[in-house]
Amino acid sequence: MTAMAPELPIYVDSETGVWTTDALPMLYVPRHFFINNHVAIEQALGVETYAKILYDAGYKSAWYWCEKEAELHGLEGVAVFEHYMNRLSQRGWGKFVTEAIDLEAGTAKVRLEHSCFVYQLGKTGKREEYMFTGW
């Protein structure tokens, strides 16, 4: 494994300590912190309920982010989706690989490599990445 600097811009406000990337405030937390919270909520609510909540919230957030980035960079169509997948890949969730995309149907087949969930939880025998489906 080789190391590299982050590929996305990170700005830190010297007064507030707020991190910003792509003009959005960000949180920088350890992977285990996020995953442990995710697993605890899943256990409390059940996978189906939690997956639905995550889908709806993720869809809303992804739509908002894509609109803002498309406007900022003059992107349209598939280019917006590709930019989004690239940015997700640069943030440590894993490497998102688009295998197929049908803009007319509004569908895509995406493979996730190097998932943060698998790195933290190991192979569990079930799909852990359902939180990304709304994204």
Q: What are these model-predicted stretches?
A:
Residues 1-109, 114-132:
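N-terminal accessory segment detector
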